[in-house]
Amino acid sequence: MPRYTVHVRGEWLAVPCQDAQLTVGWLGREAVRRYIKNKPDNGGFTSVDDAHFLVRRCKGLGLLDNEDRLEVALENNEFVEVVIEGDAMSPDFIPSQPEGVYLYSKYREPEKYIELDGDRLTTEDLVNLGKGRYKIKLTPTAEKRVQKSREVIDSIIKEKTVVYGITTGFGKFARTVIPINKLQELQVNLVRSHSSGVGKPLSPERCRMLLALRINVLAKGYSGISLETLKQVIEMFNASCLPYVPEKGTVGASGDLAPLSHLALGLVGEGKMWSPKSGWADAKYVLEAHGLKPVILKPKEGLALINGTQMITSLGCEAVERASAIARQADIVAALTLEVLKGTTKAFDTDIHALRPHRGQIEVAFRFRSLLDSDHHPSEIAESHRFCDRVQDAYTLRCCPQVHGVVNDTIAFVKNIITTELNSATDNPMVFANRGETVSGGNFHGEYPAKALDYLAIGIHELAAISERRIERLCNPSLSELPAFLVAEGGLNSGFMIAHCTAAALVSENKALCHPSSVDSLSTSAATEDHVSMGGWAARKALRVIEHVEQVLAIELLAACQGIEFLRPLKTTTPLEKVYDLVRSVVRPWIKDRFMAPDIEAAHRLLLEQKVWEVAAPYIEKYRMEHIPESRPLSPTAFSLQFLHKKSTKIPESEDL
């Protein structure tokens, strides 16, 4: 029998429907009837006939026609809002619902599984879990570890031993012993009281990453959670039932208590929850709609769910992966700019970089060689200025391997720390099943990921800083030998004038955002937790910096492609022509001024989806795999003994000597 969950004036009502031929209007009237029956204060209605209403789907807020049949208009167990005439939409209906609601009309439940054991999760795995590409299951080894760990907790309860967080209070109340008959209440109270975050909720992708990472850490078997509870949590993840987790409120020690408490609150059926099926709604109704029951916390389990660095680390994981993606593509964008500005490839000579063998520097120089003019990929643009009088390029072109290179090495360093953190037990106390005891420690302290993510923000920012200077060179006719601001009829048209200002503004914001949050600490919990990492802000800040870097490079990409227009009919190299074609598939050339923001967003989306890398990567890898010899075209402005033998041109001597 179909059933619908209907929201009327702050109340959720389960309305069964014995006949699918009934209409949306019937559902609305029946919901209002039940509301009037169950609410003493019914808003002045004496009967259903007094209420005039509209019916909307919670999923996307689509307005329904009252005459449509339920079997056509709605799915079984769907969530519906009845909006009574004269009422504003219930303020507690959906947090930030008008902002897109995070609903996916094309969402498909994943069929593939990823096995978690607490030891092998990668940053790529977690990002894919966040995108909803996999469900989760535990390895048999992980299940055994979890069971053995729980046996230790059960023994503590049975023997009435005084152990922190299990039979005592928390923080300042660590010496307060809790009666045995209140241990479960203790855990629920912990989750409720610590759910004190503020700000916008995490997106479904980020909440999914947070939940998946907490599952992975619990799978290590050092937190004392029961296998039954952990499997319940996994079922919720696999159904994409995601609690409302505000992004602000963690100081990064003792772990990420506030956000993880909000996560746990949804799992116990309280607070708000989101799923692709329901959108935002009360957690208990979302779980019910998916055939799931709220978790009933056993002793220690509330603490097991909320104590750890998973908020910092999951956001840090996204930051690392996005930083890696934009760093790769920054090399391609810069190479295209160098072509437009008629730069030389001499600065990327293998022998130069062998003398300063930083891994990132060598790799960036290699990418430039694989993309720019060579015997393998000749460029008509490069050939057109082969014998110009320019000796060397500006630092923003010539020093890309050195500047971009250290960013690559920074990302690699941070990724190593984040990967270690992904597979670390960060609870307190730790449960050692092999020793049959619990031990209090400080693995919950977020200093490692906090420091790493501050470093990541500082490192990745430099890509935007150098990109903005290249945009200046593209737009400045005295430096580029191109029309001012890359547009015809300058004066009538302003071209990239303010796009460059946008890039400058983003770079300036980043300079403030790069101040390390982890240099700060405030004593909390009555001086019990007297040093904290501020890692949550480090992670959120790093993501903001990375987004700005992506946007600045999107502007440079558009500017470089526009510069190509003024060099036609000359062609650049094959891989860079492919990049140009990709951009032109979503953004047409500027003939005259037009609304520019959508074009910047389109280019940003190409970078965010790694499309620029996808079109250039095959050429880079072919260059690598086939060991194509390095081309070293001769130039009159670079000294070469071989060149002197081939060409008799010399600097004229003064007659006075």
UniProtKB/Swiss-Prot annotation:
**Could you name the Gene Ontology cellular component terms for this entry?**
cytosol
Which residues does this entry mark as bearing 2,3-didehydroalanine (Ser)?
Answer: 254
In the UniProt entry, the disease listed is:
Histidinemia: Autosomal recessive disease characterized by increased histidine and histamine as well as decreased urocanic acid in body fluids.
Any one Pfam family here would be Lyase_aromatic
- Please provide the record's keywords in A-Z order: Disease variant, Histidine metabolism, Lyase, Phosphoprotein
- What are the recorded Gene Ontology BP terms? L-histidine catabolic process; L-histidine catabolic process to glutamate and formamide; L-histidine catabolic process to glutamate and formate
Q: Which reaction does it catalyse?
A: L-histidine = trans-urocanate + NH4(+)
Q: Which residues carry this modification: Phosphothreonine?
A: 396, 637
Pathway info: Amino-acid degradation; L-histidine degradation into L-glutamate; N-formimidoyl-L-glutamate from L-histidine: step 1/3
What does the entry report about post-translational modification of this chain?
Contains an active site 4-methylidene-imidazol-5-one (MIO), which is formed autocatalytically by cyclization and dehydration of residues Ala-Ser-Gly.
What is this protein's name?
Answer: Histidine ammonia-lyase
Which ranges form a coiled coil? none
Q: What class of enzyme is it?
A: lyase
GO molecular function term, any single one: histidine ammonia-lyase activity
